[in-house]
Amino acid sequence: MKLDALDRALLNRLQARIPLTAEPWRTVGEELGLAPGEVLERLKGLKKQGVIRRVGGVFNPAGLGFAGRLYAMEVEESRFYEAAAVVNGFKGVTHNYRRRHRLNMWFTLSARSEEEREAILGPIREAAGNPRLYEFPSEQVFKLNVFLNMEGNAEKGSPEPAGSQDRVNLARRLPCETDELDLRIIRELQGDMPLLPDPFAEVADRAGCGREDVLMRLERLESTGVLKRVAAVLRHREAGFTANGLFVAVMPQDKIGEAGRRLAAFKQVSHCYQRRSYPDWPYNLYAMIHAPEEAEVQRVVREFIEQEPVGAYDILFSTEELKKTSWSL
């Protein structure tokens, strides 16, 4: 897929954060030397080509009272896709991948309560033939910020605003109070926002309020960690990032905090967590690593383990995207 230098710069800028202003495309255009209309036309073209999955709000479910967890299980090939269809049918499941490992199905599930969670997991277990289902809740979040560097600058990492991870962690502990108008605005932005010259005015019309109400409430939701950002979300493979590796490692408890922060600093890492371990699955440090080739993922892992007291480790490459969508109410 042919992208010029301005396309790539625009994709990087729009992944970072779309300004919460009446004229967001003008603000972006001034930074890149483009007219607002050209920003919008290029954005529409990149979405039509499939490089951009969607443009809208990236929300933190925990800030609205949902608990997200990672799950893995070994599913026999004869029932793999039947089980995947059941998993994917639940709204609370946003990601589901086949990975190159004995545990070949990995999915995420957000639910408001343990009762709701079990009502979903029961049918999933049954469809998969009742294998052991590993549950990996996060115990510490070091990074949660997908940024695919489209400009090929090795020094350019994810432009995460200062304090943003702290706000997300706070929202995990103290869910934000929201009213019905907040929820209407969230619903309008959890899919695709309107690609218009004044997009937030259209969001306001649909939500039944004024544009300034929308912008003010989005700023508040962002400051409390419920809204991570309004941004463009890319399709990894179409953007050239075909290698997607889940790195898991065994780290001493007294070292995992510092090691996790150092691992999170790699620009290729989008997610980095401390997660629950088990006697037969001792890994407690997890990171998602994205790159154009598996060799680069392996290079990042080598660089990390040469500097850290890592015990056992593994890299589970994804071989098939079974479901990938944004969380929604």
How would you describe each model-predicted region?
Residues 1-329:
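A compositional/biophysical signature of low hydrophobicity enriched in polar/charged and small residues
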